[in-house]
Amino acid sequence: MKNVTDSFVSLGHWPSAGSFGFNTDILATNLINLSVVLGVLIFFGKGVLSDLLDNRKQRILNTIRNSEELREGAIEQLEKARARLRKVEMEADQFRVNGYSEIEREKWNFINSTSKTLDQLENYKNETIHFEQQRAINQVRQRVFQQALQGALGTLSGCLNNELHLRTISANIGILGAMKEITD
């Protein structure tokens, strides 16, 4: 058993300059594997993520266009309301002379209701934009997390097994024993 441990300890050290050897240090090789996996994920996932973001962007832009059309319709209604208001104001001047104040109240009620409608449409547009942005962000986060998790689990299950784990522990114990003998 000691010979196996000694051979593992000697394999765990870097070979001297000019010679060839294998690095069996599991930590160093995992860094390489992880960097390769991350590189592959970034290379291949970039297109999928880009398409997903482009689709989301188009949906958000369509929502913004629809909201702008609603806003333009509301502005058009507001202009009609202003024209009607001018007409009501002229009639109000005529009726004011006669003592009528009912028209004035109707005018202000109409202005307030139109203003509230316009404010509600603006709020609806802003809420829709915010909601679509949050939904797009959450979906992108979820997909990226799932892809990263699947890649990491695939890498881990392909690289680790019990025998390799036990051999690594034995080699590290041997290294620590050798270091203790050197210091004693």
Curated annotation (Swiss-Prot):
Family matches, as Pfam families = ATP-synt_B
An example of a Gene Ontology cellular component annotation for this protein is: proton-transporting ATP synthase complex
From the record, give the cysteines joined by S-S bonds.
none
Q: Which UniProt keywords apply?
A: ATP synthesis, CF(0), Chloroplast, Hydrogen ion transport, Ion transport, Membrane, Plastid, Thylakoid, Transmembrane, Transmembrane helix, Transport
Question: Where does it reside?
Answer: Plastid, Chloroplast thylakoid membrane
Kindly give the PANTHER family that the UniProt entry links to this protein: ATP SYNTHASE SUBUNIT B, CHLOROPLASTIC
How this chain assembles, per its entry, is: F-type ATPases have 2 components, F(1) - the catalytic core - and F(0) - the membrane proton channel. F(1) has five subunits: alpha(3), beta(3), gamma(1), delta(1), epsilon(1). F(0) has four main subunits: a(1), b(1), b'(1) and c(10-14). The alpha and beta chains form an alternating ring which encloses part of the gamma chain. F(1) is attached to F(0) by a central stalk formed by the gamma and epsilon chains, while a peripheral stalk is formed by the delta, b and b' chains.
Q: Return the similarity comment.
A: Belongs to the ATPase B chain family.
> What is this protein's record name?
ATP synthase subunit b, chloroplastic
